[in-house]
C-alpha cells in the first residue's frame, strides 16, 4: 500500500518484542499510565485493499497515531482448527492481522480514539469486509455468540468441561451467570 509501507530489518526477538519496546518508550515519556483503546482485527486477504481505502485513507486519513499501527499477513494453515480464536470466514490461505495500538495521551484523545475505533468497526460491518476482532469486548452474550460464530458450540462445550462451576473469567460477560449461579450448567450456553 503506497505511503504505508516501510521495511525495517530486525531480529526475530526484536519483532516479538515490538509492543514491549513501545511500552518502554511510553513509560520513559511518563505516559504509559493512560488509556490504550487498542483495536486488533483479522482482515481477509481479499478485502485488505478495501480496508486500507476505507480505514487508513478514509476514517483515519487525518489521524496522528500515538502508538504503533501494525499490519502483517498470517498463514491460515498455521492456525490449528481446534483453537477458539475467531478468524475471518472463507477459504483464503491468508488473512492480515491489523493492530492499531494507539494511546490516549492528550486530553480528548480517548473519546476520539473510541469514536474512530467504532467507525472502523461500522465500516467493516457495513461494507461486508468480513473482519473479526482479536481480543474484543462485547456488551452482551449475543455479541459473543456472533463473534465466535460456528465456534460457539465448541467454546461452550469447553467451558462446560473445564469450568463447570463458571468461576473463570466472569467479568468478560461471555457466559452470563444463571440465576442459581451455575452458569456452565445453564441453558444460556
Q: What are the functions of these language-model segments?
A:
Residues 23-30, 37, 127-189:
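Activity-critical C-terminal alpha-helical subdomain
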Residues 51-58, 123, 158-161:
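Generic, well-ordered alpha-helical scaffold segments in large soluble proteins
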Residues 58-63, 126-127, 165:
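Secondary-structure transition/capping motifs at alpha-helix termini
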Residues 1-116, 135-137, 145:
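C-terminal substrate-recognition/cap domain of FAD-linked oxidoreductases
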Residues 109-131:
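Long, well-ordered alpha-helical scaffolding segments within enzyme catalytic domains
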Amino acid at each position: 500500500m503506497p505511503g504505508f509501507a516501510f521495511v525495517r530489518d530486525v531480529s526475530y526477538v526484536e519483532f516479538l518484542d515490538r509492543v514491549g519496546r513501545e511500552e518502554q518508550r511510553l513509560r520513559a515519556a511518563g505516559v504509559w499510565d493512560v488509556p490504550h483503546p487498542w483495536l486488533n482485527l483479522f482482515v481477509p486477504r481479499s478485502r485488505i485493499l478495501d480496508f486500507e481505502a476505507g480505514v487508513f485513507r478514509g476514517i483515519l486519513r487525518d489521524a496522528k497515531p500515538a502508538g504503533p499501527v501494525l499490519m502483517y499477513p498470517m498463514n491460515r494453515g498455521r492456525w490449528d482448527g481446534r483453537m477458539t480464536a475467531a478468524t475471518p470466514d472463507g477459504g483464503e490461505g491468508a488473512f492480515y492481522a491489523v493492530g492499531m495500538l494507539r494511546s490516549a495521551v492528550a486530553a480528548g484523545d480517548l473519546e476520539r480514539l473510541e469514536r474512530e475505533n467504532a467507525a472502523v468497526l461500522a465500516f467493516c460491518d457495513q461494507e461486508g469486509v468480513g473482519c473479526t476482532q482479536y481480543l474484543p469486548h462485547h456488551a452482551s452474550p449475543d455479541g459473543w455468540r456472533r463473534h465466535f460464530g460456528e465456534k460457539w458450540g465448541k467454546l461452550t462445550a469447553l467451558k462446560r468441561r473445564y469450568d463447570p462451576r463458571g468461576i473463570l473469567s466472569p467479568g468478560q460477560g461471555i457466559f452470563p451467570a444463571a440465576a442459581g449461579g451455575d452458569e456452565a450448567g445453564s441453558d444460556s450456553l
